[in-house]
Amino acid sequence: MKTILIIFILTLSTTIVLGQTNNLNETDKNKPFILGVIDEIQSKELNETRILNIYLPEGYNPKDTTKYPVIYLLDGSADEDFIHIVGLVQFNSLEWIKQVPKSIVVGIATVDRRRDFTFPTTITEDKEAYPTTGHSDKFISFVEKELQPYIQTNYKINSSKTIIGQSLGGLLATEILLKKPTLFNKYIIISPSLWWDNGSLLNQSSKILDSSFDQQIDIYIGVGKEGLAPTKLPRVMEVDAKLLAEKIKASKSKYLKVFFDYLPQENHATIMHQSVFNAFKLIYTITKE
């Protein structure tokens, strides 16, 4: 396992404006802009090395006693959702905003999202079209047995654990919520691909629905105006997301908080950023001075 700095070089570009004739070569003093670290974990569960993009909040000091919430981000590659979600976390944790506590973000870089984020399907066409699918059980074992213990050992985290997933990532986050809910205590589920296996996950039994379930969990489910899912049998993304919210809201447990957020101005491609921004307002309660 090794840690490498993520370095972004901010290239200064200038043009001649109002007679200004500064020579770029003489005045340019580029410096690295450090956003976080790149870490690696060797997974026995997945039989591969996984890249972790990690944002550490301002003031993070390995030598002090402060511990931080951790936000796990699916599709967390640098060219996916890591950078803009880190921006939301940093912005919302500013001293004059304090919507979100200063947090560590762990972006799990993608290798094969269809393999990692889907459970086995009974739909023949999907098996043939996407032959690597159906191994979410291994990815969940990786998260539970390897990733979370690694983060616990190597970074200063407290007991607050959030997962963010969109599309197939939202499907996986939903599967974890229903099958292994105590892995996280905050779930941000966006445009979940509940059409997978003809919506079978909506019929999944779960202990979170029982009155005996006694762990506090906050759940945000966001969806845009997205229409028909890519299935042979007609399914509507908005309808499935609402059905999921209603299923969880019907729980007999008093320890669940469920927020359903319909964003008709957003579609499947644009919803992620605004939805996470909304989720932070709903599921984080910060005492403001």
Q: Which role fits each region the language model picked out?
A:
Residues 1-26:
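Bacterial Sec-dependent N-terminal signal peptides
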Residues 21-289:
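Non-catalytic cap/lid and distal C-terminal segments of serine-dependent acyl enzymes
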